[in-house]
Regions:
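An alpha-helical support segment within catalytic cores of ATP-dependent transferases
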Residues: 1-21, 84
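Active-site beta-strand-loop-beta-strand hairpin of nuclease catalytic cores
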Residues: 32-36
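Activation of the activation-loop gatekeeper triad in protein kinase-fold domains
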Residues: 39-44
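Active-site activation/catalytic loop segments of kinase-like enzymes and analogous catalytic loops
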Residues: 50-84, 99-116
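All-alpha amphipathic helical-bundle segments outside canonical DNA-binding/catalytic cores
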Residues: 85-97
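ATP/Mg2+ or Mg2+-diphosphate-binding catalytic cores
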Residues: 104-138
Length: 138
C-alpha cells in the first residue's frame, strides 16, 4: 500500500531515460577508486534518472545501518557535474529513496524468504526496512 501511495506522490514528468536500475557495489568493478566496468544490466529500463541516482545511494551510501551524508554529497556532486537535477527531482528525492528502499526490501523478502528460504540471507530485507526510519541528507 505504501509503495502505491509513494508512486502516486512522485511526479510522473520527472526527466526519464535509460537507467541501469541496479548500481550496487557488487555490480561495479573498480580499482584504485576508478570504475572499470558496470555489470548486471538485467534491470535496465526507462525510468526517472533521479530514481537511478537514489537507488545507487541505497547501494553505496549507507554504512552500519546509517546514511552517510558525505557519500550522498559526493554522488550528487559527481552526478550534477554532468546533469544537474531539476527542482522537481530535488523535491522528489525523499519519496524516490523511500520507494527504492521498499522495492529492495520486497525483492530481498521474495528472494530470501519465499524463493530460496533458510539461507544466511533470510533476514536481509530487515536491513532495508530499518532504513525507513533514518534521517536522510536530502
Amino acid at each position: 500500500e505504501e509503495m502505491r501511495l509513494l508512486k502516486q506522490s512522485i511526479p510522473e514528468d520527472l526527466p526519464c531515460g535509460i537507467i541501469h536500475g541496479d548500481l550496487y557495489p557488487d555490480n561495479v568493478i573498480g580499482k584504485s577508486g576508478e570504475v572499470l566496468a558496470l555489470l548486471d544490466f538485467e534491470e535496465i529500463c526507462i525510468e526517472s534518472f533521479a530514481m537511478d541516482l537514489v537507488t545507487t545511494y541505497v547501494g553505496f551510501g549507507w554504512k552500519d545501518g546509517l546514511p552517510v551524508p558525505e557519500l550522498w554529497n559526493a554522488l550528487l556532486a559527481g552526478y550534477e557535474s554532468v546533469r544537474p537535477l531539476t527542482d522537481a527531482e530535488h523535491a522528489a528525492l525523499p519519496d524516490l529513496h523511500r520507494f527504492a528502499v521498499l522495492a529492495v526490501a520486497a525483492w530481498r523478502y521474495w528472494q530470501f524468504v519465499i524463493h530460496v528460504p533458510g539461507t544466511e540471507h533470510t533476514n536481509r530485507y530487515v536491513e532495508m526496512m530499518k532504513r525507513l526510519d533514518k534521517t536522510l541528507p536530502f
